[in-house]
Amino acid sequence: MEQFVIQSRTSLCRKREGGVEKALKQDIIAFYHGDYQGGGNWRVPSTIENLICTFKNDITTYPQQTLNNAINKLTQILKVDLPEILRLSGKQNLRVCVIPRSKRENSYRCNQLYLRATIQLVTQQLNGFIDGTHDIIRHTDTATTHLARSGHGGAGELPYVGITKDTCNISDDVIGQDILLIDDLYTKTVNIDEDCIQALLDK
């Protein structure tokens, strides 16, 4: 696991009404488990790329055993990384939230939401963590960014400043909390995570 900084100055994002502005108003400390390599790595079992693709379960529909293997792999990763993040944060506890998928909550099959379910299960098993995995719920479709380039992003808009507030319900339970926000894949300049972080800060 590595630590880095999500920088406000690199979070320039389009505004819905035109122009650009920073999606994130302050720098944020972040962590990642491993680098994402493009190409055909998603086809290679046990890679981070394969794990992410399996949990999305949208390009290829995976059998239950493959999904179970992904759940077990992610569980192992989280049980190592989460306590280390808590230690490095210096906090007594962290509320764990999850970046929602791009489409509205009720448009996914249960087996497309195993990433969040796995994070929830591990969070409930570890000391020092509060389950906030359902604090951010998507109610309006946005474009699926990892499919948008191929023209298969579906209904909804690509990221703009304020898209999280416009398309998600955010629980008041996040107010005043130290939050660990988890996403399966962070892509600099896309600004999905930056906008969601700012929405939580504004709450």
Q: Predicted segments — roles?
A:
Residues 187-192:
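Short acidic, Gly/Ser-rich segments with clustered Asp/Glu that frequently serve as metal-coordination loops
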